[in-house]
Design a protein with these regions (language model features):
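Structural core segment of the AMP-binding/adenylate-forming
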Residues: 1-79
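Active-site beta-alpha turn of Rossmann-fold NAD(P)-dependent dehydrogenases/reductases
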Residues: 107-110, 152
Length: 180
């Protein structure tokens, strides 16, 4: 969530050992920079060596001073476009190597009774969710043809279902622009 404090962001990064972060804007970039130097969360100190973050991508970099610790989404897209053909075989190999029991994502509890607890969701879990949504009619032909409207945060399991439905069912998704 955009409202998370730097220590909360840091905790999630340490817990998942994430090496790449995508920040919406300068405000979120500042949180990543702050937690990178270490933080305290639920009275437990975390030092910089525990933060594995190596690369930050900023989606809306307008007004930000260039720096070595982040890259704009536009620059990443340009760099990626230049390498599409050269990396096609490697990307296909990686896609083919994916197994249903591979980790796909983490979903966290709210943390109301202590530090948030991460739930590992596998590729198989996500695929089963999509297959079941279609089978029981949660995602039907009309929705596939007309598109889906996503208003839930991507930290929410149903929000993730809608997010993944776009590429899985080859259907458009409209994402609400209201911060959550």
């Amino acid at each position: 969530y955009a409202t998370l404090l730097p220590a909360e962001v840091g905790y999630l990064h340490v817990d998942t050992e994430a090496v790449i972060a995508i920040a919406q804007d300068g405000e979120q970039l500042a949180k990543l920079r702050e937690m990178r130097d270490g933080f305290e969360f639920f009275d437990k100190p975390y030092d910089a060596s525990q933060v594995k973050l190596q690369h930050i991508i900023v989606m809306n970099a307008e007004g930000l001073e260039p720096a070595d610790d982040w890259e704009s989404l536009a620059d990443l897209e340009a760099r990626g476009s230049e390498q599409l053909e050269a990396t096609a075989d490697e990307r296909q190999r990686r896609a083919n190597d994916q197994q249903r029991d591979d980790t796909a994502t983490y979903t966290y509890t709210s943390g109301t009774t202590g530090p948030p607890k991460g739930v590992v969701q596998t590729s198989g879990n996500m695929l089963s969710m999509l297959e079941s949504a279609e089978k029981c009619g949660v995602i039907n032909q009309d929705m596939k043809a007309g598109g889906l409207f996503l208003f839930l945060p991507l930290a929410h399991s149903f929000g993730r279902l809608i997010e993944l439905s776009g590429p899985y069912f080859n259907t458009p998704i409209v994402i609400a622009g209201i911060p959550t």
